[in-house]
């Protein structure tokens, strides 16, 4: 178990936080670190926080003082989540920070898939390269690129989170009929959805209705090859499938077979590979979903803010491996305890404060899987003996304390 003590008595008494950057992070985000409180850079040693984009941390040996990792982006396949949770290290991501960039690319993907715009551009260039008078051949050749409009077509969206929800609302504004599937739909997201979006409980209802299907879900063991031969067989013939989520969500062999038979009219993906690039009716891009300056800036700013909020106040926002919990400050001292999610832990912890005659001003506790997080604001400071007793309590992974 580790202990981080912050005095908070005066600015000069607060130790500098050390933040290591594992990738180039936008200055828009880095400038949100107060220079008097934070040392930030790629050469920082023994960091208390790590900022990362795509660098692989799977085999990284964490220093004992590491308290948190923030990913400036959404996917966290490059971070060992279970190992971090066991060590009491929350991993933060930035859901929604790149949502608009991805949304715009989804609309672009539907248009490209409908009218084969990349193929049309390629054809024009081929005509010019062959010496043809392009101005005279285009009228005859353009008929090969006729495709449907989006208006009054049906879009199916798998995953109605930060990205899927704004894709849905934008598609409604384009005159599309929208069906969404998300078994984990939150109340907040549901309230943001346009009232004309149809939310279905059975994904097959979405498959059979949709002219276009787009996925906005995390890659997990359960979502691996979610779009397989069985799923494709349930879809409307001639569907156009867009995958800007993760390549592994789609079974490439099943998709290629469906493209060959015409079951799928086009597959537009942000995750190219050599096999896909040789197939007709595939539009493959080099993972451009979040590749806008605005998106990179938003992700960096959100990553820095969540990291600071945890280090300075113990609040956990947008964590992918530990309970989500925030609590307004009250009292004189705050203790945050990450522990195993087992019976009796809350009673064990609070009894130690009562034994020392310290009143609990506010308390919150939440669990996620095998772990739970307890935040306690106390009416007076506890002695070092109490802090040490909490730290040594069985099943405690991390104890964080700071003064108000």
Residue ranges of predicted features:
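Phosphate-binding beta-alpha-beta segment of Rossmann-like dinucleotide-binding domains, i.e.
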Residues: 95-154, 312, 316-320
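Rossmann-like adenosine-cofactor binding region
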Residues: 58-60, 183-276, 291
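Short glycine-/aliphatic-rich beta-strand segments at the starts of folded cytosolic domains
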Residues: 329-339
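Glycine-rich Rossmann-fold phosphate-binding loop(s) that bind the pyrophosphate
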Residues: 160-161
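Rossmann-like dinucleotide-binding domain for NAD(H)/NADP(H)
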Residues: 237-329, 373
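N-terminal Rossmann-fold NAD(P) dinucleotide-binding loop
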Residues: 164-165
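An N-terminal-biased, well-structured beta-alpha scaffold segment characteristic
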Residues: 15-94, 208, 228, 240, ...
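Conserved small/polar residues in nucleotide/adenosyl-binding loops
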Residues: 400-404
